[in-house]
């Protein structure tokens, strides 16, 4: 493909294969973006004038409640490389369309540790900063160096550091002020040469112990393998049962509210944060409200993990959203706690 070849405009494009819930919806127009230079010609095409835009990578963090009446940009940018190194770290760049899990595995194959706790998280590299993905004691922002993005209004190419991205818990600038304004075309990570394992989570520690790592520091590959095993045991494969992983964020509340809650619910699962606030396990709250395994139509709560909502076949995004709202209502009424969805609902 030449540098100047435009991405094809695809009308009435089916999005079922482009969202991990498997919702059978369509886009008015879609363009598959394989080169950064294709972005602005697609956005500025007269057929897209005045239409809303949606950027999709793996579609693992979106609930499509109906057909999208605008232009969907399907990010298919690929490539990964070590851009530089110093005495302390490697700096590794990956294109926005690289599958996240494959990228994590590749870094380990190249002898670079640091992302192994984030194995098997669905989606693409370009989506990772938007959500500030995290799991098993590590957040992406801890390994983040910078990203490259195209601003869709002006066509400007920008380089943003962590401060500009304003990372928070499953949050960033791109979920708020920057939403739908940018396409992240590549991300650079800083992977430390002096690496320390993070294996404190109980499920992870048990899996490592079962694999012969009890009392001995695990390798990065051992952590990667253990994370994959734990996630596969707890979470359904989107190719077999449509889902977007954890549907709700773990809520964080103040110490006074937590003490009052603990009086009513002594066994509440909680984690004290550095600032004194307390993070609650959303899955535990949902399970206590009796939702694990329950369904509303073809939308259901997974029987093994209450934090995961699933499409059992033929569910619409609206049905999943209705289920989510019913869960939020019950958790609010019983615990006085608000659950916030992780995926973007459109």
UniProtKB/Swiss-Prot annotation:
The gene is murB. It comes from Paraburkholderia xenovorans (strain LB400). PROSITE patterns: FAD_PCMH (PS51387). InterPro entries: FAD-bd_PCMH (IPR016166), FAD-bd_PCMH-like_sf (IPR036318), FAD-bd_PCMH_sub1 (IPR016167), FAD-bd_PCMH_sub2 (IPR016169), MurB (IPR003170), MurB_C (IPR011601), MurB_C_sf (IPR036635), Oxid_FAD_bind_N (IPR006094). GO terms for cellular component: cytosol. NCBIfam families: murB, PRK00046.1, PRK13903.1. It catalyses: UDP-N-acetyl-alpha-D-muramate + NADP(+) = UDP-N-acetyl-3-O-(1-carboxyvinyl)-alpha-D-glucosamine + NADPH + H(+). Gene3D superfamilies: 3.30.465.10, UDP-N-acetylenolpyruvoylglucosamine reductase, C-terminal domain, Uridine Diphospho-n-acetylenolpyruvylglucosamine Reductase, domain 2. This is UDP-N-acetylenolpyruvoylglucosamine reductase. It holds the Pfam family FAD_binding_4. Its cofactor is FAD. Pathway: Cell wall biogenesis; peptidoglycan biosynthesis. Residues 22-194 form the FAD-binding PCMH-type domain.
């Amino acid at each position: 493909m030449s540098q100047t070849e435009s991405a094809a405009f695809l009308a009435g494009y089916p999005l079922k294969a482009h969202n991990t819930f498997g919702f059978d919806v369509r886009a008015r127009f879609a363009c598959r973006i394989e080169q950064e230079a294709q972005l602005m010609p697609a956005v500025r095409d007269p057929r897209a004038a005045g239409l809303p835009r949606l950027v999709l990578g793996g579609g693992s963090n979106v609930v499509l409640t109906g057909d999208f009446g605008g232009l969907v940009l399907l990010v298919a940018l690929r490539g990964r490389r070590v851009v530089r190194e110093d005495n302390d770290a490697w700096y590794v760049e990956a294109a926005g369309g690289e599958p996240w899990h494959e990228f994590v595995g590749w870094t380990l194959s190249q002898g670079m540790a640091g992302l192994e706790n984030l194995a098997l998280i669905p989606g693409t590299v370009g989506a990772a900063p938007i959500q500030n993905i995290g799991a098993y004691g590590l957040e992406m922002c801890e390994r983040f160096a910078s990203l490259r993005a195209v601003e869709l209004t002006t066509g400007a190419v920008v380089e943003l550091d962590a401060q500009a991205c304003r990372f928070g818990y499953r949050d960033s600038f791109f979920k708020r002020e920057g939403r739908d304004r940018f396409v992240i075309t590549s991300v650079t990570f800083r992977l430390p040469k002096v690496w320390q394992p993070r294996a404190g989570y109980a499920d992870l520690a048990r899996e490592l112990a079962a694999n012969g790592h009890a009392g001995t520091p695990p390798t990065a590959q051992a952590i990667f393998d253990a994370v994959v095993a734990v996630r596969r045991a707890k979470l359904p494969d989107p190719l077999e049962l449509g889902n977007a992983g954890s549907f709700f964020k773990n809520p964080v509340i103040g110490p006074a509210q937590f003490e009052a809650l603990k009086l009513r619910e002594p066994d509440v699962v909680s984690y004290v944060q550095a600032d004194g606030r307390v993070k609650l396990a959303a899955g535990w709250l949902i399970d206590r409200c009796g939702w694990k395994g329950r369904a509303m139509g073809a939308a259901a709560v997974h029987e093994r993990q209450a934090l995961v909502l699933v499409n059992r076949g033929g569910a619409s995004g609206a049905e999943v959203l209705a289920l989510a709202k019913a869960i939020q209502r019950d958790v609010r009424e019983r615990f006085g706690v608000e659950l916030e969805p992780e995926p973007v609902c459109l």
